[in-house]
Amino acid sequence: MQHIQDNDKLYRYLFQHRAVRGEWVRLNETFSQTLNTHQYPKAVQHLLGEMLVATSLLTAIMKFEGNITVQIQGDGPLKLAVVNGNEKQQLRALARVQAEIDDQASLAEMVGNGVLVISIIPTEGERYQGVIQLDKPTIRECLEDYFIRSEQLQTHLIIRVGEYAGQAVAAGMLLQIMPDGTGTPEDFEHLMTLAETVKDEELFGLTAEALLYRLFHQEQVEVYPAQTTAFKCGCSRERSGQAMLLLPMAEIEEMLAEKKGVIDMQCECCGTQYFFDKPAIMLLKEEAAKLADLGLT
């Protein structure tokens, strides 16, 4: 039986005598809504689920206000896969597929020669971008390598994607040795061994409390209040209009003629459509010109 009270939730926790911290997340509606507006191949759906889980866990462990973008770029059938998340656990995802992809395709078969790009964009402070070659079989292993290289912290990820109670679900756990240097490799290995005994149905179906007890009942674990995850696209009519105004006016006029006087712009992420007729476009141009005169663009 699935305990829906912990669907679309993220929990952080601390092993009090081990100097290791952890996180657990389960994405139900958050994941389903990502897939609803696109007919992605199954292998791409699976990869996006993994990336959503990874981004959620990364955003929680960074503890800052802002955004994290996890992006895969390659020269294979999957040209691009990108997930964005913020400190409120608002997530969105997008993929661009340029050739047929088998349902069982591996990461390497989908991406070809590719890189994993992690962009950290705080509301205040400097941006950071890390680029890692996708030279390991899974996104999980690539991210663990990222933590070793960039943070010098032992990190272990468990990421599972599947179906439970008739619904798509993606879930995962993170263990990381504390950055204060008090943790030992032996403690970390011990907890990692326990975590690896988790079954898919436990990740997908148990409450966080039941899952942590099942895995770590001999440990003292302090669990922090849950965060709710959600699919949230950042698109708007204003942003769509601004994007359209980047086109030459002659091209906009041509589009208006082809579309019988109304241009529709569809968000690539969530599928929302925005419609603009010529009066609306001229109004947007006037507003943009006023802002430019005021030096606000």
UniProtKB/Swiss-Prot annotation:
Q: Which GO terms describe its biological process?
A: protein refolding
In terms of Pfam families, this protein maps to: HSP33 (PF01430)
- The answer, when asked if Cytoplasm is one of the entry's keywords, is yes
Q: How is it modified after translation?
A: Under oxidizing conditions two disulfide bonds are formed involving the reactive cysteines. Under reducing conditions zinc is bound to the reactive cysteines and the protein is inactive.
The cellular component terms of Gene Ontology attached to this UniProt record, alphabetical and capped at eight, are:
cytoplasm
Question: Which Gene Ontology molecular-function terms are recorded?
Answer: protein folding chaperone; unfolded protein binding
Q: What does the UniProt entry say about where the protein is found?
A: Cytoplasm
Which keywords has UniProt assigned to this entry? Chaperone, Cytoplasm, Disulfide bond, Redox-active center, Zinc
Disulfide-bonded cysteines: 233-235, 267-270
Keyword flag Zinc: yes
Function of the molecule: Redox regulated molecular chaperone. Protects both thermally unfolding and oxidatively damaged proteins from irreversible aggregation. Plays an important role in the bacterial defense system toward oxidative stress.
Family statement drawn from the similarity comment of this UniProt entry: Belongs to the HSP33 family.
This chain belongs to the protein called 33 kDa chaperonin
Q: Which organism is it from?
A: Haemophilus ducreyi (strain 35000HP / ATCC 700724)
